[in-house]
Amino acid sequence: TLKSQTGDLKIKVSPVEGKKDTFTFTMPNVMCRLVVKTEVKGIEKDEDGYCLVGTLDDLNKVKQTIDLGNNDINIKLTNNIVGYDGNPIGEYNGTFDGNGHSITLAMNDESNDYQYYGLFEKLDNDAVVKNLTINGSIKANANYVGAVAGLCDGAIINCVNNATVTNALKDGVTGGFIGQNMLQKSPILISNCVNNGEVNGYNVGGIIGYSAGYTYNFSKITDCVNNGKVNAENNGAGIIVVGSHCMVTNCVNNTNINANKNAGGIIGVVQYGTKAEIINCANNGSVVSKETAAGIATTYGAITVKNCL
């Protein structure tokens, strides 16, 4: 039990590395905010405070730290990492700089324990993933699956996905990079990203599964290219399979889209009651569906298309 006081109170604890511990503090008649952070042991930092990750063991160490609650650490790769077969890295809110390097995934989970599944489970508002290449494969049975993240509220910039992404869940949503992005505090920026990996599932987008913004603040996807084959049991698209208040600019789909319901070269479906803008985009692949197909987009909502091929 701690006596009431004003100002900052620092308490140093020593948890066991790799384990979650519970600490109970009693402060009568006091309202306070408690922040618990853990340091990454055995990891060097550069002059800017980035944790330098060059091995699979290093990656597992920073994953442990993030999972324990220190989710705003900044990370920079110093080497290619091969064979990551663990669970998704938990909710992350820092900057992950691939620094031109790659991570090769061998992730496979059929448990249906995850709503969001990817290298990262969730990317929060201030999270940035940049300059990263993803190789290998990822297989899951989750609501939203993407090679980089199941859910993204942050930014993904200048990244490449070469991994095959497969989601076995019926009604699941899958993207080459992101399963779902939801606009929270500011426009989501997905820019300068290229997908070369095959994407398979029920609702499938080459770049993003479900992309959502607000009427006054659209989510933004810019300068992205899809070269990976899209195989969808339900809806499929080259860039976004389901869009809601989103803007897609300077994006290109170069591959074939195969779906059983709605298929679009850029957007599969614009949701009813929402809007989408597609500007300076091109579809160079064939779009095949048993029901509805369009070179640019199919829609139940309002759509603006400018300078598209």
Language-model features and meaning:
Residues T1-T22:
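Surface-exposed interfaces of beta-sheet-rich extracellular modules
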Residues E39-L309:
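Surface-exposed repetitive/solenoidal architectures
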